[in-house]
Amino acid sequence: MHSYDYWLILAFFAVVLLPAPFLGRFYYKVMEGQSTWLTPILGPVERGCYRIAGVNPQDEQSWQKYTLALLAFNLAGFLLLFAILLFQDHLPLNPQNLPGQEWTLAFNTAVSFMTNTNWQAYSGEASLSYLSQMVGLTVQNFVSAATGLAVLVALCRGIGRKSTKTLGNFWVDMTRATLYGLLPLCLLLALYLVWQGVPQTFAQYVNAVTMQGVDQVIPLGPAASQIAIKQLGTNGGGFFGVNSAHPFENPTAWSNLFEVASIILIPVALVFTFGHYVKDLRQSRAIIGCMLALFIIGGATSLWAEYQPNPALNNVTVEQAAPLEGKEARFGTTATVLWSVTTTAASNGSVNGMHDSLNPLSGMVALVNMMVGEVIFGGVGAGLYGMLLNVLIAVFLAGLMIGRTPEYLGKKLQAREVQLLVVTLLVMPVGVLVLGAIAASLPGPVAAVSNPGPHGFSQLLYAYTSASANNGSAFGGFGANTAFHNLMLGLGMLIGRFGYILPVLALAGSLAMKKTAPIGQNSFPTHGPLFVTLLTVTILLLGGLTFLPTLALGPIAEHLSMGF
């Protein structure tokens, strides 16, 4: 590693951690309807949205009504996007006259963007019109991120409130999350990316002739606006097929820094938002400490693995630097590793290099980041409500060990809460192991694998892990665009999204109705180093015990077979 690499890592943490506490407080004030510096500008727009939709912002909903509103909104978004993708050849803003998507691919894509997964079994510049990219995908990028934020806020209210049956109003939370929480930051990042060289145009693709006399088509489009939300909203779906490895999507070292940092900016800020909801920022610092510990462990392991020389070249008289296969030479090894760890620690899935070319242990780190449930920062809202589920599980385990009724911030965890927590523990195993096993047992789906042996198994395992974790990244050698995988991966995305959201909202409703007992000296503290350690071990054990056999068959076996 060179000095540039160390400065890159320091700059990354600075860009994320310095503004996060202030942004977290801003989100708390916004979601609770308090006045901010944006209120004079966006307040009239917000009130206009309520009048048009017939929503009274003072009316709050029970968790059941909140859930029904969320499901109805997401279903409508799915159907609209599905129709746009099917019939894009009959719609405007299609200068390349691209055909509509085949129905299983359209289903997969619509589910993918509705669930904030952004799994892409297609190449954007070769498959989608400008209208599909803007009105279809970009809109879903905003509302899927806002949905995650709304669910998190409902859970925060459930923990922070007492003796109430309401969690807020879904329509109000969605409006505020989009207007205040996402649009301003996305506007700033989009303008910055345009300055750095990312295209934002409705012009047709450019036909050029290379120096060798070969015709070449250079794709353009309204890319900057979509890239901004796909990073800040932890969506990850690229405007171009190779995502942020494309020079039009990520043209400079500065764009690379701000794009990778923006992946976890909002998830980190929302941890501080939670602290404001429960009126105890020590809880935020404990959760941030656990997230950082897991992130640094994974990052250090990945960096070490990627800087190891390839054993296949041991007997060749060449000087080996870090392997550069699948990496953008403009950015180098460290920038690629930092992105791969960040994009899988969050449920983002964007890439600036090819994960299929990572060394086995680096690929395993990416897998583990997703297998633990995308709780190491995670997606906008989704990451923190996933982490809070692990917090409650850790509190329950601590209560069992000391022989006391478990409680978190004065709320007792009883049978109903524990049952809901157990349901969430089944989401990743069902999505990854059950669906993945079905795919691995049939000859047709297995044909999508491009490599024999352990790496081929890792390709299939990565695909179903990514879908179930709502991440969206992939090992590029996996041929995902088949009817079977389009439908099965779409099912995995739905399980991974709503398998968490429904129990989380039920849990929020249950906790909101409870009284808050005063926290005394005999209460188990959830803000100190001991609890951070317990929480970290709980996350690793739950993920490790569940998925260790599959990891042994994939990346671990590949690592050993290569002779590292």
Curated annotation (Swiss-Prot):
The chain crosses the membrane at residues 4-24, 67-87, 135-155, 179-199, 258-278, 286-306, 382-402, 420-440, 487-507, 528-548. Keywords: Cell inner membrane, Cell membrane, Ion transport, Membrane, Potassium, Potassium transport, Transmembrane, Transmembrane helix, Transport. HAMAP family: KdpA. It comes from the Bacteria. The gene is kdpA. NCBIfam families: kdpA. One of its GO terms (molecular function) is P-type potassium transmembrane transporter activity. The system is composed of three essential subunits: KdpA, KdpB and KdpC. Part of the high-affinity ATP-driven potassium transport (or Kdp) system, which catalyzes the hydrolysis of ATP coupled with the electrogenic transport of potassium into the cytoplasm. This subunit binds the periplasmic potassium ions and delivers the ions to the membrane domain of KdpB through an intramembrane tunnel. It is found in: Cell inner membrane. This is Potassium-transporting ATPase potassium-binding subunit. Its main location: membrane. Belongs to the KdpA family. One of its GO terms (cellular component) is plasma membrane. It holds the Pfam family KdpA. It comes from Pseudomonas fluorescens (strain Pf0-1). It is a multi-pass membrane protein.
